[in-house]
Amino acid sequence: LTAKLSYPIYDDLDIYTRLGGMVWRADAKNNVGGGDRSNHDTGVSPVFAGGVEYAWTPSIATRLEYQWINNIGDAGTVGTRPDNGMLSVGVSYRFGQDEAAPVVAPAPAPAPQVQTKHFTLKSDVLFNFNKSTLKPEGQQALDQLYTQLSNLDPKDGAVVVLGYTDRIGSDAYNQRLSQQRAQSVVDYLVSKGIPAGKITAQGQGESNPVTGSTCDNVKQRAALIDCLAPDRRVEIEVKGV
């Protein structure tokens, strides 16, 4: 019975030693005075061994070993007490050493899908014509909008308020008016509780009209104002909800 101690030299090559003991039984038969005499003895002797071992696979290895056993037998009993030395080459097989399956990292969780919600309010509901101050009806409309925004938890996203005018008036005037109207909506929603750092106002002037060429043949001013009403609007985009 021996204990094996190994030390790796390379990934697959080890040197090792074995230390322990061997229980032995020695039998002797001598011819004494014309007759045979048998004798035997038992005992324990130390075992020393050393070698190198190369692993071809996790299960199969080849080894070269020298083993020494000291004092086998008893000179007083069996007439001799030899030592035993042995050089051996062997192959070993380890059970249960199959290569482990590669560890597959779990797939990363999909990135949360960023959605953008759109709301459109008529400027004629929010403001008087050519004005940027909210009407009471406009405040009521924004109160309802704020309730919807709260349900979307806009604190986790960004809110962009886009102001649009119709094409009546100069480009510079319409740009300024659209910015003022968008800012009025932003200020009101901030007063309701939307963080100021999460909401911005952008005036778009008379760009992106929704009426197209519908009103091109309308000449009377009052009728043209009514026809272009859909272009006068405030759009609200809630991003990242």
From Swiss-Prot:
PROSITE patterns: OMPA_1 (PS01068), OMPA_2 (PS51123). Belongs to the outer membrane OOP (TC 1.B.6) superfamily. OmpA family. With TolR probably plays a role in maintaining the position of the peptidoglycan cell wall in the periplasm. Acts as a porin with low permeability that allows slow penetration of small solutes; an internal gate slows down solute passage. It is a multi-pass membrane protein. It comes from Shimwellia blattae (Escherichia blattae). The chain crosses the membrane at residues 1-8, 13-21, 46-55, 60-67, 86-94. This is Outer membrane protein A. It is found in: Cell outer membrane. The gene is ompA. Residues 114-241 form the OmpA-like domain.
